């Protein structure tokens, strides 16, 4: 085994890292990767799905799955990690290296309070601490990550916190052992832009203040520009470019890096010319109120007096932070959320005035695309079978008609060569294209797309959006596109409605709302949207920190 060169100014040193899967005929998936992380430095590893970035992070943590084998050198403060026994690796994990996961809610136990979980994390690394001392330390950690009113939050459960607050709790737990290296795996993917900015500020401050190294795994070039000092670009398991963030993002040497940057949607790129909309109203939402809860926990008004409409061939973007009510509106339209007050009119039919059977018939003409296609596809069905299912069971097609319809849809979503694959054999973008094909298979009059690209890499996102746009232009369905990514909304939508705490704050043509916002809240959302420009992102962070300090 090649031994690491110990250097006092390096937290992590990776040399000639190679990872192979399988024992009899091993397949190498990471090919000779080298990089270092200095104290207080944030190094971002970027690349598409399958690039090897997550496998590299798992190698550092010593968490490769059974059957995987790593060679080369991974040294933490000069100590070689490859070759350590499991018990020795367990002592390194948590104590010297800690992981911040992608899904902040899933990483917390829903049946225990926040305080219990942070205290347990503290005591796991220092059993000499008593319960009272561990509780004081837990409160200090919550304060460190800017959790408001930490004493009160200690008694709350994960479901009572927002996604951003749950992610901060996850960071606090990762800091419980005062690790020298933090590995942040897509830490802001599930967060809206304003919360994302706040979490990135916390990470940047913690790294620089305490001299921790941070290994950031991400596909978001705006996040890279905001927080990273250096960038490692990976493709197909190999390192294709490595350098300072300013150099890599503004003057990339590798064609692949330029390709990644070109795929990033940017606010303001699309011209301001608005397409002519049809006069036919396909969807009307009038004075909609949606409430949850009851006598025990009180009533929460998730949607408060919302009115909007969408015409044939038009895409309306719903944007806003987590908890703004945008997804609840989508669920109310498809009948999956209770309508407390107000009404929903679909293609001229008031849904509150028709029978249940008629509502079911009408809603069959509404297509839905969810954020995570893996949960909406049957793992036992091939691509062809998944697309055929709604066409046969609801559309009633059989035999040759069914085969021709499915083949046409496969071509529409560029998956004709994947017709006999199963979901686990597809990439995230390919699975989402299957979901889109299913959603449009019955020629919907309305389509609800709820964060359909938020979990995808930028180049894959661009491919999915291109498929989506082609289908919408040809089929002319009315679309409600729910997203927290303003650049994607700017690229795709015709009109935009901005939501905050269940109310519409601003609505109008896309260019008007996103170029000349009239409401302070919309202006704040736009200012928080990350862009792949390190100079601009650093200036924005300085403004944010100055505003929060005043």
Tell where the protein language model's regions lie, with residue ranges:
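Conserved ABC transporter NBD signature motif
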Residues: 69-80, 342-350, 362
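ABC ATPase NBD coupling module
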Residues: 81-98, 116, 124, 131, ...
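Conserved ABC ATPase "signature" region
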Residues: 133-152, 350, 400-417, 527
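Conserved ABC ATPase signature
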Residues: 156-161, 165, 422-426, 430
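A short, proline-enriched helix->beta-strand linker immediately N-terminal to the Walker B motif
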Residues: 176-180, 441-445
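ABC ATPase "signature
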Residues: 242-243, 251, 507-508
